[in-house]
Regions:
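Short, small-residue-biased leader/transition segments that mark boundaries at the very start
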Residues: 2-5
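Transmembrane beta-barrel strands of outer-membrane/channel proteins
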Residues: 8-10, 20, 40-46, 56, ...
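Residue-level signature of outer-membrane beta-barrel architecture
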Residues: 10, 24-26, 46, 60-62, ...
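Residues that define the transmembrane beta-barrel architecture of outer-membrane proteins
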Residues: 14-18, 36-38, 50-54, 100-104, ...
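Sequence/structural signature of outer-membrane beta-barrel proteins
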Residues: 25-29, 43-49, 76-80, 128-133, ...
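Repeated loop/turn-to-beta-strand initiation elements of outer-membrane beta-barrel proteins
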Residues: 29-31, 65-69, 116-120, 163-165, ...
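C-terminal outer-membrane beta-barrel translocator/porin domains of Gram-negative envelope proteins
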Residues: 152-157, 161-259
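Outer-membrane beta-barrel "beta-signal"
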Residues: 153-154, 293-299, 316-327
Length: 327
């Protein structure tokens, strides 16, 4: 199954734009109806503020679900904002400064099934970030504007979801450990532990309760561009991506999804998150709230186009237009 649409888009970060979305679901063995469908999404966007992006992501499930290939490839150029590093810098409106950023990422993991719903395998990543026209370079604290980051590691996943792109039931856990040592050519040596877990439970006819917890923990010396960021189209929706950044982050959300009529549905969610440079700095006073509402249109079976409006602390808010559920 393949479909494509061209649509107007708007977000608080990138303003008015024109986007392209193409999505496909397929089975590597058409005779095995118990095999979860693989998925691939091609996405592109260009906006009135000079933002442009092109990328592809997906999961390829091999016959009998013996192996899985997860992949992401994208690049974008964005006249963005930068507040500095740490929670205290991000909360000060006066720290807002302009920064032009060009970024590319290639990331993939190849997983072997070692038991029912349990997978493990190697992963690799490459990130290139080029910053220029920095309005207040002192906010970088002496770090390079341009960095290239090479990483290798291991990924462990438990996945009992019925559908990857739009789960109706099941549990998902992924732990990825990525190492970026100096001998791979990195300017900044550090390692990253990513944790993501989510649960999906039907509550009544057409209603689904979904919950998620995410964490990113950097150990060593990550550059400003590779730190943990709050705010994107998947979590802490409504916050400007990267306004709050530090070595570590923890964030969670609970979302109620309700089918309304034919291809139409709505969601509401609440969440919270924070960034910190060491675990002893964790405190309730630095937890940022998040909540929002959204509309869903079934682009194709088990593939939703979503329009979300998220709210955060001190009047922060933003629109998000994307494909597939946030988690």
């Amino acid at each position: 199954q393949r479909q494509m649409c061209i649509r107007d888009s708007y977000s608080t970060d990138t303003k008015l734009g024109l986007g392209l979305v193409a999505a496909g679901l397929y089975r590597t063995d058409r005779n095995d109806m118990l095999l979860p469908p693989s998925n691939v999404s091609l996405f592109g966007d260009v906006s009135t503020v000079g933002f442009y992006m092109l990328g592809i992501r997906g999961t390829h499930i091999f016959p009998q679900d013996k192996y899985r290939l997860d992949y992401t490839l994208y690049f974008y150029s964005f006249p963005s904002k930068f507040w500095g590093i740490g929670y205290d810098m991000g909360k000060v409106d006066a720290n807002e400064s302009d920064l032009d950023r060009w970024q590319a990422q290639v990331k993939a993991s190849f997983l072997f099934r070692i038991a029912d719903n349990l997978y493990v395998g190697p992963m690799a990543s490459y990130d290139y970030v080029h910053g220029k026209n920095m309005e207040r370079p002192e906010l970088l604290e002496g770090m390079n504007l341009t960095t290239a980051n090479y990483g290798v590691g291991l990924s462990l996943a438990y996945d009992s979801r019925d559908v990857l792109t739009n789960p109706h039931k099941g549990y998902y856990l992924n732990i990825t450990q990525c190492f970026r040592p100096k001998f791979l050519g990195n300017d900044y040596a550090f390692s990253t532990t990513d944790l993501r877990t989510s649960y999906y439970h039907p509550v009544w006819k057409g209603g689904l309760l979904a919950g998620e917890l995410r964490g990113t923990f950097n150990f060593g010396n990550p550059s400003w561009a590779m730190m943990a960021l709050l705010g994107n189209s998947y979590s802490m929706r409504g916050y400007y991506e990267g306004r709050y950044r530090d070595k570590h982050k923890i964030e969670g959300q609970v979302e109620l999804r309700q089918h309304v009529w034919k291809r139409n549905g709505v969601v509401v969610w609440i969440g919270a998150g924070t960034v910190f440079n060491k675990f002893s700095a964790l405190c309730m006073g630095r937890v940022l709230p998040n909540y929002g509402i959204g509309y869903r249109w079934e682009f194709k079976k088990n593939v939703n186009v979503r329009l979300d409006y998220g709210f955060g602390k001190n009047g922060q808010s933003g629109f998000i237009f994307n494909i597939n559920e946030a988690f």
